[in-house]
Amino acid sequence: MSSDIPCCGTTFSLYVVIIIALVAFAGLMAGLTLGLMSLGLVDLEVLIKSGRPQDRINAGKIFPVVKNQHLLLCTLLIGNSMAMEALPIFLDKIVPPWLAILLSVTLILVFGEIMPQAVCTRYGLKVGAIMAPFVRVLLVLFFPISYPISKVLDWMLGKGHGVLLRRAELKTFVNFHGNEAGKGGDLTTDETSIITGALELTEKTAKDAMTPISNAFSLELDTPLNLETLNTIMSVGHSRVPVYFRNPTHIIGLILVKNLLAVDARKEVPLRKMSMRKIPRVSETMPLYDILNEFQKGHSHIAVVYKDLDEQEQSPETSENGIERRKNKKTKDELFKDSCRKPKAQFEVSEKEVFKIETGDAKSGKSENGEEQQGSGKTSLLAAPAKKRHRGCSFCILDIENTPIPDFPTNEEVVGVITMEDVIEELLQEEILDETDEYVNIHNRIRVNMHASPENLPSVITSITQSSSGSTSPNQTSHMATPDSSPTTKPSNSSPTRKPSVSSPTREPSDSSHSMAPKHEESTQTL
């Protein structure tokens, strides 16, 4: 069967041009469908805010077009379908039917699908930005047809929203961008480690970072501050030492080592006579981010970790109101018990009093006997506390002499101690070592590649120790942990009434970090 239009005429040439235009239009619609629809709204917003200059421009042109994804999809598919359906009709006019079918399939497959989709997959952002004005015209032309269909899709599938990565996916995404992954990323190992640690910190609680109470270095309330105790504190190298009363788990406060600089070891002043600070108590289920936020307020950089025995008895499986109990979680103030905070009721000032102070109405007042008092408004204004507590806050001081020993609920069992350094180590996912550390990991007893020696101690302490022969024996400091022998605690032979300066026979000093242990055996035996 011959073609309807003879070859090489004007009509024939017009049909050929139309066929080429239809193939190009179909290919453009197919390429834009893949290229534009593969660009998520979140990806475009990221490029607009933090992409390269050219990518920002391209993403800014594409975003208004891609914003209504269902409308764009319907417009591009309608245009593609019209071109593909019209192509065989024009081919049938200039070639035989069998050749029209063969040519239409070949042209659509090669130039209408494969080539444009391959190009738009690679350069989708650039091609989409160039063709954005043309797509806007198509949206207007096909609006009467595409808009109703897009609304049906919105009703059935919902409007398209940007899909955000979950936490686990985001960590994997960051790891892929590390230079160690070999995928062309430029993130260093430290950068990926810190980002991953920041993402994982939300899932970790105080129980994951604390130092067990059996490994924490602490002092008894009635410990005499003699040469032995001061040497032990010096060799441990901690800046804060918890203080307990009778039972090692009954920690009532802490003492700053810098406050002991002026102590005369010959007077053997009891520890209870020194200025001590209150120590916060945190639940073992409290997230590390909340603990870090509390530490940043300046109340304290160390806290006692307790376990609520009542919560253990009411497990989710046996509790009748397990679902409601999860909904009614404890607040941050209930998990982080800071006795150093100021009572709110003590400093509540009414709006009228504040107005009087600001307007000067409180500058003069009358006492109970009717006498005028000048400057009372100024005094009231100065008496109002500042929002930020200073370091010398009287609420943070533990007055043992004038107040009873603090007592705590019996259902709260002390299980460990946590410091700001512990939280930072979990964030960095690396151990922070200082000059006094012997072990990288106190549980696995991995030794640090540094050796503490008596030369590291101050010369004054060394000379005093050497001159006072007989006052300190090696077994007095044998409570310090050594890698080859289990630590034991023995009382001092020079004074039978002295109490050991450590709380537990198996305790290893670790106030600054759960992975930090004291100096090695040579240093403590020399002292």
Curated annotation (Swiss-Prot):
Residue span of region Disordered: 307-335, 358-384, 464-527
Annotated CNNM transmembrane domain residues: 8-191
Residue stretches making up the CBS domain: 210-271, 274-334, 366-435
Matching InterPro entries: ACDP, CBS_dom_sf, CNNM, Ion_transp-like_CBS
The protein's name in its UniProt record: DUF21 domain-containing protein At1g47330
Cytoplasmic topological domain: 37-70, 115-126
Record field: transmembrane: 16-36, 71-91, 94-114, 127-147
Chain positions found as Phosphoserine: S315
Residue stretches of biased makeup (Polar residues): 502-515
Comp. bias regions, Basic and acidic residues: 358-369, 518-527
Any one GO biological process: magnesium ion homeostasis
GO cellular component entries: plasma membrane
Origin species: Arabidopsis thaliana
Keyword terms: CBS domain, Glycoprotein, Membrane, Phosphoprotein, Repeat, Transmembrane, Transmembrane helix
Residues carrying sugar: N475
Membrane protein topology class: Multi-pass membrane protein
Low complexity composition-biased segments: 464-501
Pfam families the UniProt entry points to: CNNM (PF01595)
Protein's cellular compartments: Membrane
Ranges of the Extracellular topological domain: 1-15, 92-93, 148-527
